[in-house]
Each structure stands twice: as structure tokens, then as C-alpha cells.
Amino acid sequence: MEPFIGSAAVRSGALTRRGLQRKYTALYRDVYIHRDLAVTARIRAEAAWLATRAPLAGTSAAAVLGTLWLNPDLPAEIIRADRHAPPRIVAHSWTLAPGETCMVAGMDATTPARTAFDLGRLHRADVAVPLVDALLNATGIKPADVLAVAEAHPGARGVARLRALLPMVDGGAESPQESRLRLVLVRAGLPAPQTQIEFRDLRIRVDMGWWEWRVAVEYDGVQHWADRRQRSWDIDRIALLEEAGWAVVRVSAEMLSRPHVVVERVRAKLRMAGCPV
């Protein structure tokens, strides 16, 4: 059940006041959800819109636009000139240009490009890149769309940071870990890898890599180690790639805590393939 206005539900007879208090919990004043409903970033955003009727922004806009992997515990974000907002909602007094808001399921929110602009300029790269990657993945916008918003707001806080960030984003990432892995490689001076490389004849896709040098990099999450069928398929898949002349570097979550090891392994494979790194 989606968030709803408690007093309206009682007035309509859909709920009694006692039923409202027993089975539902308030996220914001007079905005309720069922006690058994897990609070996601989207649920929090929907509740914030009901509580304020103000345009959603930042991670809240990203949530209603379909972005995955968002932290559900972050405060909701809205845009309001007077910056007045209930507790646990952050209000921004940003000036929006015409065309920088859209309607999503009946709610006002910043457009995908404007949302990416705000996420990219206000967060450090290791936070912003996974967020913007996920937003691009969900909406299909391109870095050029975000750059166009930046050009319309040359004096906005964090624009220089955003411009430096955009060459590092890629909507092909299918998890925050893939985004962080790619960021580690690019920050180390390696050429930006292509994401989601498909081998149609082999029916295989790899997370990222370089066609020119036939080097692939795979992020292996927990399921790659815990699931027997997945592990067996991974072994077969790597063998097929190697038979096709590709070198594959596999990276685990633990290895991401040792980025220098990841970088040197990938660099070594690229050098062996003739890449001048």
C-alpha cells in the first residue's frame, strides 16, 4: 500500500482512527504507510510529496524516476523557496529553469537531467558516480543532457565538480559496485572501459572491458561465490572468453577495499595486450 493522508482516509470511512493508529505508521505528519511495508527511497519520496506538495529533488527525484540501489534511510529532498520542511525532509531553495521539472505518477519532480546535475554537483565522486550511473541506467539520458543543464546554470554551486565528474559516469553500470570498480580504474589513469560488452555468438556479456585489447573486468558479487549454479556457469564463461582470446580479471567486494591490487592486475593484462599504460 502506498503512502496516504491519514485524515483523508478517516474522513472517507476507509479507516477508523483506531485502525489507522494500530496498523499504520506515520512517516511525516498525517502521511502514513502500513506498518509491514518496507520503507524504500521511493516510498519515502512519495510520502514527502504528500506531506509538502513540493517538487521532489535529489535522491527523492531519482527514486520516483526509477533509480535503483538508493539508500532508503536518507532524508527526502524537495525544492521550496522558503526552505521550510517537516523534520526528516531536506528543502533546497534552488532556482529551476523552465522545463526542469516533470510529472511522475502525479508527483512533481526534477527532470532526469536536472536530477543528475544536482546529484553530481553536490556529492563527492565516489558517491555521485554510482548515483548518476544508476539514474542514467534507469532513464536513458546521456551525460550530454546533464552538461546542457550545467551550461544553463554556470554559477551554481558545484558546477566545476560536476563537469569533472561527467567523463567518469556511464549508464551501463548495473550495480553500485560496478560503478565503484570502474571509478577505481579510471582514477588510476587507465582508459575508460566500455560497459556491458556482449558476445552474441557466445551468449555472454561482461561487466566492462576493452575490445581493442581484449581485456575484460568482472565484478563478482556474493551470488557468484555462494550460488553453485552461478559459480559453475562463471567457470564455463571464463573458459569460453579465454578460448576467444580474452583475458579476464575478476574482482570481489573484498578486493575493492584494496584498489591498488585491482589496478595493477588490470594494468598488467592491458600491457600484455599492447595497451600503453
Regions found by a protein language model. Name each.
Residues 1-159, 194, 271-277:
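Short gly/ser-rich loop at a beta-strand->alpha-helix junction or flexible surface loop bordering the NTP-binding
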